[in-house]
């Protein structure tokens, strides 16, 4: 029995699944995190606000602070779990009372870099970072790569690893792929909450393919600051705008 208990303790400490609890993340955010995870020994789980009493079962509790509305009792539950040793970080808290973090400054900066530059690669490596550096597992660990800056103010296509700073570069790529159609209608796609580099983009890809199959040249734009400049240069025949 003692041997079995020792083996179980060793497994739990060095090899067991890393569990990351998510509090107040929107569905599309959760989907991006989950779909980016490629490690069998890392799991995400959403934590409803009425179940904050079980934060202690997670190896990291990651909360999204924007729009987080909790009662004093719920906030006390989060603080109590942090005091008891559960790693907790409420990211992007807009209410100072919800600015709760039990991570050291370096670990907090690491998590912030991954999630602040949200893309599939960073989300995947954030999960690995949690297992390696916060959960401190020794087995079934894939070393985390450093966070990379997420592409912004760019055009993009079906290959999520590619982005294009100029319309000319994007059209050159389409021609090289045999996709560009001379004198075909131009359709621009802008807006939407889905970051095309977050790993959760099946709906965007489906739209791009459908429009291309219909004989159109498609220009998906991921930009806030230069959106109008891109549209002026593209000169689209129609614009599909995802307001939300």
Question: What does each model-found stretch correspond to?
Answer:
Residues 1-244:
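An N-terminal assembly and electron-transfer interface module characteristic of large anaerobic redox
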């Amino acid at each position: 029995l003692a041997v079995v208990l020792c083996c179980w303790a060793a497994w739990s400490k060095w090899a067991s699944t890393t569990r990351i609890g998510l509090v107040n993340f929107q569905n599309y955010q959760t989907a991006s995190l989950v779909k980016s995870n490629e490690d069998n020994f890392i799991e995400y789980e959403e934590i409803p606000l009425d179940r904050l009493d079980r934060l202690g079962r997670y190896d990291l509790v990651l909360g999204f602070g924007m729009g987080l509305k909790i009662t004093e009792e719920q906030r006390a539950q989060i603080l109590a779990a942090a005091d008891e040793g559960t790693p907790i970080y409420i990211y992007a808290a807009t209410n100072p009372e919800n600015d709760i973090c039990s991570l050291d400054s370096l670990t907090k900066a690491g998590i912030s870099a991954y999630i602040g530059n949200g893309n599939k690669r960073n989300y995947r490596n954030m999960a690995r970072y949690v297992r390696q550096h916060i959960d401190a597992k020794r087995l079934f660990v894939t070393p985390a790569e450093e966070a990379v800056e997420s592409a912004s103010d760019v055009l993009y296509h079906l290959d999520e690893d590619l982005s294009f700073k100029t319309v000319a570069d994007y059209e050159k790529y389409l021609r090289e792929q045999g996709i560009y159609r001379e004198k075909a209608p131009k359709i621009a796609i802008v807006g939407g909450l889905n970051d095309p580099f977050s790993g959760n983009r099946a709906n965007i890809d489906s739209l791009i393919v459908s429009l291309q199959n219909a004989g159109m040249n498609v220009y998906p734009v991921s930009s806030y600051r230069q959106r109008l400049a891109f549209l002026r240069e593209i000169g689209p025949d129609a614009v599909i705008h995802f307001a939300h």
